[in-house]
């Protein structure tokens, strides 16, 4: 027997898919044929029988794949409940859980997911049937089946929905002359199923939809969220009052993004719900940059179930699954308690232990299931974040359910209530007298601790949608039909309904009526081309089907936060709130709202679930093996910004990264650098220049006061004033150099410095050149161009060369400013010529310095009274040292414009200071402190003799004009002395050209 059954299994596995494809092809051909004429009834019967046979084969195939049993176990005692009515609505609910024992198809009775949903459907039918004007006298009945949470068993049970259709007499053997079907009275009492509410599990709904689509029966699920069920090419008669898992996956991903959980583990069950939900989550996670650290599949077979959970918990250990503290759950309801139990045991969780795992669970998490939080399970479940389809409680239903009591009609019509009572209250029905067993008839329900199933509202919405679709269809195709007005209904126990409503075309009903149901506020409206039919919604919730037949996408986000383990909640929560689940947010149509005050963690201490911590500002991610969520941090260069998390790019010249390193800003707008007056680099040169100007002005004042004294005259007043003015010009250049660069400032800088130096050193050169010519001449004639006017003209001509050259330079390169970039992070406002061009301007001044130094060296041996050249020489030597030092200092600190500018200012001032001190300080000393040397002497014989000896080397031609042209030196002598000296010697004392050699 075993061997034979195995062969059949293999044969059916090979042929089942071909049969289903063939059947679909035949039915499509039948639909096209029926458009023109009705085929004989025998053909339609053959199609129906073939469809039934193929579904049985499919059922056997599914059973063979999901169980190892050879024979199907006997079904439970109560297979279905039937409520009479004019139009039947089917129902498929998981009244029993799935058995993990392969020998039995059904497990324990499920109160919330099973019995509550069955009663919700019956309650909705009662509400609709109680309104006499709704279907104008038609009553809705029900045929409700138990799926036992098993797809194969549910498919087998669902054949009852199509048996009535196969055995009905609507396929008449008679055809009217015009080719239409005859309108015959039905002889059979069997009723066709107009639509089916169910199933709950997606795997059950898929199998059910595959069967019902062959017979064009509409299906409305109140709980199945499988994304594939939205595919109208495969499930053209399927609708649901809940959203697709695609939306749930989007909500879960947005929660992870909200809390910055970029590295999570994913656990899913080996069924359509788990696998499709996991695929949807992975798809959305990739879009948001969330990585899957661990992906584990939970096997649903008994022998491999425990092993897969053990492996899962082992892999979730913190030392093995580093970083991923968040675990996303897409598993069946029945698997979660075992996962929690094994987690608590293997990880040795205690009430005071730090939470290691945060569950992010789909709506399959049953908050009303006590097994989830029994014993140590609550330690593992604490802090879990659970998505629940946004639903509202139905107080009238809860009141109705609490009124159910053995012996009442409402109780006895649902045979599964007896089983629930026996299991829940440990009692027995119909106990014999004297029995010690508790009597179920005496037990009444208590409202304490009662929580209706979360999907009661969706079951009621599904029944309402079907009912109002039927109402709209009846108004369209049987507008004048009313049972209470039909004469047969007055005398017949089987009232006759509209013929078009007896055999409903599922395709027409689904497309034109069911999908157009729209719940608005407290009313339900069916929009069609005929009428608007209002009806009160039992929960006042807006509802409508999407074009794919899905319900509104809205989720409530809960967290498991038991009072017994949460001191804060015990202090703040109302004692009347018994639930251990706290609402922490809501998600609807891509809109996530989180109530942070209800979270079990502080908003500033959100749990971390990442592979790598975020890089600091200025660091880029260096991905590890192309893993999007795992990286090492690498520092960017100071001048680089991040175009994304993994690439640094340098800013353009003159730009610098912002503080957040997300872009660059223009340095010239906020950090433009130029000499500031408050800077130490400006204060020192300014002070030096001010003191130099004051000292120079003091010398000028002294010279003006003592302008007619011998010392002032002997120093050469004209050139002395030129020298002093040139020094003031040098000092003033400091203020020009320290000013903010502009066209005018740059023009003065390019001309003023060179011109000031040219005036200074031209005058010195004229002085030393004249002395050299005087003492080096061998002729008796007086040297040319040694008069004061000649000296001034020569000085002006020499300085004019520099001025003309500077003006030509300005015309060739107009003055202006520019941005200079000494380093990547600096922008300096400077003049629009390079530094080496500035040296070209000073080259001429350097040439004058060299000439002055040369003549100073040549005239170093002149007589003592003509030793002013010694001071000029000392001034030139010092100036050369200053300028050589400045050149190396200036170009050696090319990256610091402040040092360059400050050193240039100091060098210019020092050049003027050296000239001022060396040339004028000896004269000032005599004028101010040795005044006896600055007067005319009446008796100057001794001086005359001394002078005569000093002038022994003068040529006779040079001294010939001494009587006619008195000079500064002879001004110190009296007229008589001068005459005596003139008579006594054949040579003149001196010429006017030697006036500045006195000192």
Curated annotation (Swiss-Prot):
Low complexity composition bias: residue spans: 984-993
- Primary localization class, coarse: membrane
Q: Which InterPro entries match?
A: ANF_lig-bd_rcpt (IPR001828), GPCR_3 (IPR000337), GPCR_3_9-Cys_dom (IPR011500), GPCR_3_9-Cys_sf (IPR038550), GPCR_3_C (IPR017978), GPCR_3_CS (IPR017979), GPCR_3_mtglu_rcpt (IPR000162), mGluR (IPR050726)
List every stretch annotated Disordered. Answer: 975-999
Q: What residues bind L-glutamate, as annotated? A: 202, 223-225, 273, 363, 455
Q: Which residues form a coiled coil?
A: none
GO cellular component terms, semicolon-separated? plasma membrane
Q: Where does the source fall among the domains of life?
A: Eukaryota
Give the organism, scientific name: Caenorhabditis elegans
Q: Which GO MF terms does the UniProt record name?
A: group II metabotropic glutamate receptor activity
Keywords attached to this entry: Cell membrane, G-protein coupled receptor, Glycoprotein, Membrane, Receptor, Transducer, Transmembrane, Transmembrane helix
**What family is this protein classified in?**
Belongs to the G-protein coupled receptor 3 family.
The name this protein carries in UniProt is Probable metabotropic glutamate receptor mgl-1
Topology in the lipid bilayer is annotated as: Multi-pass membrane protein
Q: Which Pfam families match?
A: 7tm_3 (PF00003), ANF_receptor (PF01094), NCD3G (PF07562)
Which residue positions carry a glycan here? 518
Chain ranges passing through the membrane: 682-704, 719-739, 751-769, 792-812, 836-857, 871-893, 904-929
Task of the protein: G-protein coupled receptor for glutamate. Ligand binding causes a conformation change that triggers signaling via guanine nucleotide-binding proteins (G proteins) and modulates the activity of down-stream effectors.
Q: Which GO terms describe its biological process?
A: G protein-coupled glutamate receptor signaling pathway; positive regulation of lipid storage; regulation of synaptic transmission, glutamatergic
Which compartments is it annotated to reside in?
A: Cell membrane
